[in-house]
Amino acid sequence: MKKLINLISEEVTKAFVSAGYDEKYGKVTLSNRPDLCEFQCNGAMAAAKEYKCAPFMISDKVAALLESDEMFESVESVKPGFLNIKMDTAFLAKYMNDMKDDEGRYGLEKAKKPLTIVVDYGGPHVAQPRHVGHLRSAVIGESVKRIAKFMGHNVIGDVHLGDWGLQMGLIITELRERKPDLVYFDESYTGEYPKEAPFTISELEDIYPTASGKSKSDESFKEAALLATKELQGGRRGYQALLSHIMNVSVTDLKRNYENLNVHFELWKGESDAQPYVPEMVEMMKEKGFAHMSEGALVVDVKEDTDTKEIPPCIILKSDGASLYSTTDLATLVMRMKENNPDRVIYLADARQSMHFIQVFRCARKTGIVPDTTELVHIGFGTMNGKDGKPFKTRDGGVMRLEYLLKEIDDEMLNKIKENQKEKENLNIDEAEAEQTAKTVALAAVKYGDLSNQASKDYIFDIDRFTSFEGNTGPYILYTIVRIKSILSKYEAKGGDISALKDAIMPAVNAGQKNLMLSLAKFNATIESAYEESAPHKICAYIYELANAFNGFYHDTKILSEENEELKKSYISLLVLTKEILEACIDMLGFSAPDRM
C-alpha cells in the first residue's frame, strides 16, 4: 500500500500540473496547525517566484481543481498562498479497511530486494558481570534488528563477545595464583583436560576485577598477564582449554541475562573467532603496500584530502606484534564477508568510539576487505545517566549490575500492579500472575525508557518516571493495549464474532475517531523511516501518539453500549487494528503486553 501522505501528494501534484505549474510544487506535509487542517501544501509560495504571480492566485486555482476530489473533505486556499487539506472520512475508512486486510503488514510493503544485514551488538567482555552500561547496545541493537526483519531483510545478530586480549591473560594469571596446582598450568601435561570448569561464574566474576586491580598497582603481575595473553594467543594448550571453560561458563550466564532482556542472537561469536584470519590479512596489507611501519607499529594511513580534522592511522599491530581492537574488528569483517557476505554491517557501540570506527571502516575499504557495495554503519549511543546527570551508579557510588537494576524495577512494578488491583477492588490475579505481569511491564519500562530517546543522546534513567502508568512510558503503552484487549474480550463474551469483521470500518462519526484513523495511517511511513535511520525512538513517538489518539477516542465514544450494531462493529474493527499495530510496534521494540494489568 502507498503511504497516505504520498497518495495525497500525488493528487495535489496532478492538480498543480493541470493548473499549468511544475509538479515539484505539489509536495504535501502534515499540518503544523492541526486546529485548522490535517495536511498542508506550501508549494504555491515557492511557485509564485517562478511564475511571477501572487501565491494565492496559484493556490486558488489548485484548490478549485481539488474541490470535487473524493479523497478530500475540503481543500482550502488560504492567503498568502497555503493549501489547507482535510481528509474525506469515507476515503479514510477505506484506507483503514485496506490496512486491516493486509494482515501482519498493515499497508507496509516488504523490501523488494532483501538485504543481508549483520548487527554487531558489541557484546561485553566474558567473565565480567553485566552492568548497566551493557544495557544500551543490547536494547538498541535488538530493536534495530527486529525493525529490519519486519521490513523483510535477512538479519543476523552477533553478540560479538570480548574474549581476546589482555583480560584473558589477567584471568589466567589470577587463577594461577589462586589454584597453581591446576593441570592447565603444567606445560609438560599431554593428556585430556577436565570437562568441568575449575571455577563457577561467581568465582569468575570475582577473579577479573581482582586481577584488573592488581595489574594497575603490581607491575610484575601485569607483565605475567601480558605473557599469559601472548602464550594464549600463541596456542598454548592449557590456556586454550581454560579459554574454552571461561567461554562456556560465561556464555551460559550471558544467555540467561540476555533472555531476561528478551534479546536473542543468531551468532554467539567472539573476538577469538576472528583470530585465525589475522595473519593472512596482515600479510595481504603488507604485500599490497597498504601497511607500513610507523614508530615501531604496523599501520595503515586512512586520512583523506577532505578531512577537516586529523584522522590518525589505523594501527594493525603494536610494536610487540600484539593485535588491537582494530585488528580484531578488521579480521571479523574478513570472516563476515566470507561467511555471510553482508550488504550492511551495523555496529552498536558508545558514541565516544566514533574515531575507532572511522579508522576501521576506512581501512576496510582501502584494503579491499569490504567492497563499496557493503555499507558499514556505526550507531553511536549516548550515556545512561542518573538523576544527577552523571553516569548511573549504585547508592554507594559503584557501577550497578544489570540484573540488580532489573530486579529493582521488577519489584517497583509489582508493587504498583498490586496497588492498582486494590484500587480497582479486583483481587482475582494470583501472586504468580502478578509477578509475571510485573516482569513483562518492567521490561517495557526499561526498554521504552531507553528507546524513546534518540540513540545518540545521553538520557536520565529515572525509575519513578519509567514505571509510571501515565505519560510517555512503556507501562502507559501496555495499559492502553490491555484496555483494548479488555473491550474486545467483553465484546466476544456478549456473543460478538471478531473474526467475522470484514471491511467493517465505517466513516468516522466524531473527531476522536478520525484522529485515531489518521494516527493509524502513519504506520507504514513511521516504520520505513525508523528502518532507514536506525531510529527506534521514532516508533516510540508514534505509539505514544497512537495510544493518546485511542484513549481520546475511547473517552469520547460509547463503544460496547452503541445501539447501532454496524457502528459497533466498525468501532470494534478499528480497535482490533489499533491493538495489532501497537503489538507489532512493541514487538519491534523488543517487549510484549500482558493480557491483564
Predicted regions and their residues:
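Non-catalytic interaction-recognition regions
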Residues: 1-93, 111-597
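Short, charged, solvent-exposed linker or helix-capping segments at domain edges/interfaces
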Residues: 94-99
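Flexible, low-complexity linker/hinge segments
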Residues: 100-112
